[in-house]
C-alpha cells in the first residue's frame, strides 16, 4: 500500500476516533472520552482486519465456489488479468435490487460482490462493464478506505443512537443536575448529528473515485458503452426497488447508491449523477475510437 493510501487511511481513522471521543466526552466527561478512545482503538483494529467480512455479513453475501458460477468466474478472471491484479473472490448478495460492490484490504484479499438482481437484468457485455468498474476500485486501492469508512461510520451511528437513548432515559449516573438537565439536548444532538457525520464520511471518500473507476473500468473491458447501459439499468431498477434492509453507511461502496429515496441518506450524494457518468463514458468511447 502506497504512502498516499496510508495517509488517507490514517486521516480517516483519526477523524473517526476523534468523533467517538467527542461522543464519549458528551456522555461522561474525561472518563467517557477515555472509554471511547479505547473503544475506537479496538474498532480501528477490527475494521482494518475484518471490515470486509463485516460488510459481507451485513448483506448476507455468500462466497461462490467456481463450479457454482463458472461463467461469472471466467468473466472476472479475464478482466482481472487485463487489469493486472489477482483474481478476487466472488460473492452473491441475496436481493433482487441490482447492484455491485468491491471490498477487501488489498488486491490479494479482495471480494467482488454482485446481487442476484444484477445477474438477472444485465447481459454479458453489461456485466463485464460493471465487474471491470469494481476491479478498478481494487486496482486503484479504493476498497480499503471505502470498507473502513463503511464499518466505522456504521459503528458511530450505532453508538450515538444507543447513547442518545441512554441519555433520554437518564442511564448515566454520577452527574449533577445541570448535566441531567442537558441530557435531552445532548440526545437530540447525538441522534441528529451522527447520521450526518456518517454521510459526510462517505462524501469524503471522494466522488472523483467513481469517475476514475468508470474510466479505468471502461479501458479494462474495452466496452464503455456497456458500462453506460448497465448504469442506466441499475439506476432505473434502484429507483423502483431500493434496498430497504441494508446499512446506509455502505452507500458509497456500491456502483449506484442503493438507498435512493428511502432515507435521510438521499440528502447526501455519495455518487456523481448517473447522467454525468454516462456523458463522461461517451467521451471516453470517442477517445478510444469506439462507437457508443
From Swiss-Prot:
Cofactor: Zn(2+)
Entry's transmembrane regions: 9-29, 31-51, 148-168, 185-205
Membrane topology classification: Multi-pass membrane protein
Subcellular location: Cell membrane
Active site: 134
Binding-site list for Zn(2+): 133, 137, 210
A molecular-function term among this protein's GO annotations: zinc ion binding
EC number: 3.4.24.-
GO cellular component terms attached to this protein's record: plasma membrane
Cofactor binding mode and count: Binds 1 zinc ion per subunit.
Keywords for the protein's UniProt record, in alphabetical order: Cell membrane, Hydrolase, Membrane, Metal-binding, Metalloprotease, Protease, Transmembrane, Transmembrane helix, Zinc
Gene Ontology biological process terms from the UniProt entry: proteolysis
Alphabetical list of Gene3D superfamilies matching this protein: Metalloproteases ('zincins'), catalytic domain
Classification via NCBIfam families: PRK03001.1
PANTHER family: PROTEASE HTPX, PROTEASE HTPX HOMOLOG
Family as reported in the entry's similarity comment: Belongs to the peptidase M48B family.
Protein name (database record): Protease HtpX homolog
Organism: Thermococcus sibiricus (strain DSM 12597 / MM 739)
Organism taxonomic ancestry: Archaea, Methanobacteriati, Methanobacteriota, Thermococci, Thermococcales
Gene that this sequence comes from: htpX
Amino acid at each position: 500500500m502506497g504512502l498516499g493510501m496510508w495517509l488517507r487511511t490514517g486521516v480517516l481513522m483519526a477523524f473517526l476516533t476523534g468523533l467517538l471521543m467527542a461522543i464519549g466526552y458528551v456522555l461522561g466527561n474525561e472518563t467517557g472520552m477515555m472509554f471511547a478512545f479505547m473503544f475506537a482503538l479496538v474498532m480501528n483494529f477490527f475494521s482494518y482486519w475484518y471490515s470486509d467480512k463485516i460488510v459481507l455479513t451485513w448483506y448476507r453475501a455468500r462466497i461462490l465456489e467456481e463450479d457454482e458460477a463458472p461463467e461469472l468466474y471466467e468473466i472476472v478472471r479475464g478482466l482481472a488479468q487485463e487489469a493486472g491484479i489477482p483474481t478476487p473472490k466472488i460473492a452473491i448478495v441475496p436481493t433482487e435490487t441490482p447492484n455491485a460492490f468491491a471490498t477487501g484490504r488489498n488486491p490479494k484479499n479482495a471480494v467482488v460482490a454482485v446481487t442476484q438482481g444484477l445477474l438477472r437484468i444485465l447481459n454479458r457485455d453489461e456485466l463485464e462493464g460493471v465487474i471491470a468498474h469494481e476491479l478498478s476500485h481494487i486496482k486503484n486501492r479504493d476498497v480499503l478506505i471505502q470498507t473502513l469508512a463503511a464499518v466505522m461510520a456504521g459503528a458511530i451511528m450505532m453508538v450515538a443512537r444507543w447513547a442518545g437513548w441512554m441519555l433520554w432515559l437518564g442511564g448515566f449516573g454520577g452527574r449533577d443536575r445541570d448535566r441531567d438537565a442537558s441530557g435531552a439536548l445532548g440526545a437530540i444532538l447525538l441522534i441528529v448529528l451522527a447520521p450526518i457525520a456518517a454521510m459526510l464520511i462517505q462524501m469524503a471518500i471522494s466522488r472523483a473515485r467513481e469517475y476514475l473507476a468508470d474510466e479505468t473500468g471502461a479501458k479494462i473491458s474495452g466496452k464503455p458503452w456497456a458500462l453506460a447501459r448497465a448504469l442506466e439499468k441499475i439506476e432505473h431498477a434502484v429507483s423502483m426497488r431500493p434496498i430497504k434492509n441494508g446499512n446506509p453507511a455502505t452507500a458509497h461502496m456500491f456502483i449506484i447508491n442503493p438507498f435512493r429515496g428511502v432515507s435521510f441518506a438521499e440528502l447526501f450524494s455519495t455518487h456523481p449523477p448517473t447522467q454525468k457518468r454516462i456523458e463522461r463514458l461517451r467521451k471516453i468511447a470517442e477517445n478510444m475510437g469506439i462507437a457508443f
